[in-house]
Amino acid sequence: MSTSSFERSSNPTLSQWQRLLKNAGTWQGSFAQISPVGEFLSEVRTEVELTPSDEGKAMHQEVRRYPADAPPQVQILDYRSLNRATLFFENGAFSQGSMQWGPFSSFGAELGLIAGDRRLRLVQLFEKNELRPLTLIRERKQGTEAPERPALSLSALVGTWKGKAVTQYADLRPDTYSDTQLTVEQIGPTQIRQTIRLGADSPPLSSTGQIEGSQILFKEGMQPVQ
């Protein structure tokens, strides 16, 4: 499992639990349902509260949903450990989901990014081999004025993006790091080309995508990607 980051922590020896604690606080935002083709379906206001207790050895978690036409819904969790299906990165970013997948079962994952007083999470679920509606969760810490970023446009995506890739392993061996570079070019009214470099010694990987509404479809490989 990998994630890209522009900052590396000064303390890469934090335990998984210590990395979880970087998410402590009350996060206010919304759960938005988006169709597999990028169409907005619905949105509900939410609060997620993560409160450490017992000198940081336990976590109390409350998820509060506020539907427009129904009473508030509250889910409460208390835990002292993390399962193997959840992995946290140095800055508090995380991934959790199914340890195995297959074409005849239900599976999915939640990907969470954190930057200062903002969090962005995405839940992807598959029913057998079909992608279900996505859940996009945009949050900011209670009491802050972290601005909402505008919706991503194609013109904002075009360019060269440099960063660091952090790879984490399920057996909890040390994280590995490599430089990354992604170049996105628009090569026609409805086409883009992306070129990815992972490390200085790796050959570039290029693919061409077709722009269709809110989607960019990459159909060249054995596994289509959007």
Question: Where do the protein language model's features map onto the residues?
Answer:
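Central antiparallel beta-sheet cores of small beta-barrel/beta-sandwich binding domains
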Residues: 52-106, 171-226
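Beta-strand-enriched cores of mature, soluble protein domains
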Residues: 29-31, 44-51, 180
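Phosphate/adenylate-binding glycine loop and adjacent helical scaffold
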Residues: 109-124
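Surface-exposed beta-loop interaction hotspot
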Residues: 124-168, 184
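N-terminal helix-cap/turn-to-beta initiation motif at the start of protein domains
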Residues: 9-26, 145-160
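Tryptophan-anchored aromatic micro-motifs
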Residues: 22-36, 154-171
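Amphipathic hydrophobic-ligand
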Residues: 39-45, 103-105
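Preference for intrinsically disordered or flexible, low-complexity segments
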Residues: 116-118, 127-130, 137, 177, ...
